[in-house]
Amino acid sequence: MKYTLTRANPDADQYPLQDRQIVTDPLEEEVNKNVFMTRLEDVLHTAVNWGRKNSLWPFNFGTSCCYVEYATTLTGVHDLSRFGAEVIRASPRQADLMIVAGTCFVKMAPVIQRLYEQMLEPKWVISMGACANSGGMYDIYSVVQGVDKIIPVDVYVPGCPPRPEALIQALMLLQDQIQLERRPLSAVIGDDLQPVYKPKMMPERDRKNAQRIAVKNLRSMDEIK
């Protein structure tokens, strides 16, 4: 008499000859529909970041001609209150957003750095204009070749000077970054030197590269306004 050994298949049906349909637990289905399971830390970070990105308080100061466009952005025509950034503060201790609008001179660099240090955490910086980004056309001894040489910058706005719409787009990009950040929920609890995670955002130049290359019919100089 011959014997054959067959290895058990754990994925096989328990009752292969039974035609009865196997359904999931109805209680489990109701729980999945009505109960949202997540970590409390993720919920708190999402809620706190939502509040931070929609209540930015810009610091009202300017270093050069780009401040004219910055002040134009604050007018009612552009309605900056849609983004929760209409509360302009004249004190660095009451602001959390610094917009460096214009040329950063060597004599002005210590002042900007001091003002940045006086701002409380969390704080962000927008570099507005070619001069603030890289010195612009002033490649001379008296101009700092980029404000990021003295303070960290989150968003760069190109242009000389940039239009108010460009600054609004920079504000929206900063809001996207703030939503993905992970900061200590409280400076009272835990160590003061807790790490701060800032996501690495893709530059708009790279994100819209394929869209620009796909354009074949360019407008003439007379049509550009």
UniProtKB/Swiss-Prot annotation:
GO molecular function, one term: quinone binding
One Pfam family per UniProt: Oxidored_q6
Cofactor note: Binds 1 [4Fe-4S] cluster.
Cofactor annotation: [4Fe-4S] cluster
GO cellular component, one term: respiratory chain complex I
Broad class of where this protein is predominantly found: membrane
Keyword Cell membrane: yes
Compartment(s) of residence: Cell inner membrane
Keywords, ordered alphabetically: 4Fe-4S, Cell inner membrane, Cell membrane, Iron, Iron-sulfur, Membrane, Metal-binding, NAD, Quinone, Translocase, Transport, Ubiquinone
Membrane topology listed for this record: Peripheral membrane protein
Family assignment from sequence similarity: Belongs to the complex I 20 kDa subunit family.
PANTHER family xrefs: NADH DEHYDROGENASE (PTHR11995), NADH DEHYDROGENASE [UBIQUINONE] IRON-SULFUR PROTEIN 7, MITOCHONDRIAL (PTHR11995:SF14)
Protein name in UniProt: NADH-quinone oxidoreductase subunit B
Species of the source: Acinetobacter baumannii (strain ATCC 17978 / DSM 105126 / CIP 53.77 / LMG 1025 / NCDC KC755 / 5377)
Gene transcribed to yield this protein: nuoB
